[in-house]
């Protein structure tokens, strides 16, 4: 395994090598043989395309399944407001997120009849 006791800053790129998202944490560990990375302690994930930021204390990146997830409290800040949850699931590219047990303020547009 490779340990990052002083933290890490990862960049995720699209096919044209533009930075789509970033992940920072104060600690990380990567198990190359398991294709698994765990980061914790002030984890911040930024999705530049959607102008969203997710804050939490623990994230697992399962490279074999191409999934990123957490089982602890998360705060997701979007242009429309702040939503809280008890964990999240996302695809590896961080384009699709699903908060577990979400709560907060939600904006809905009413349909006209």
Q: What is the role of each PLM region?
A:
Residues 1-113:
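Mature-chain termini and adjacent capping regions
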């Amino acid at each position: 395994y490779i340990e990052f006791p002083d933290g890490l800053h990862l960049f995720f790129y699209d096919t044209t090598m533009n930075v789509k998202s970033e992940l920072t944490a104060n600690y990380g560990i990567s198990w190359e043989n398991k294709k698994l990375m765990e980061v914790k302690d002030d984890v911040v994930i930024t999705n530049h395309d959607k102008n969203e930021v997710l804050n939490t204390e623990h994230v697992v990146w399962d490279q074999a399944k191409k999934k990123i997830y957490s089982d602890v409290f998360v705060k997701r800040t979007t242009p429309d407001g702040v939503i809280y949850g008890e964990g999240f699931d996302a695809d590896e590219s961080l384009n699709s997120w699903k908060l577990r047990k979400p709560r907060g303020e939600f904006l809905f547009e009413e349909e006209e009849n």
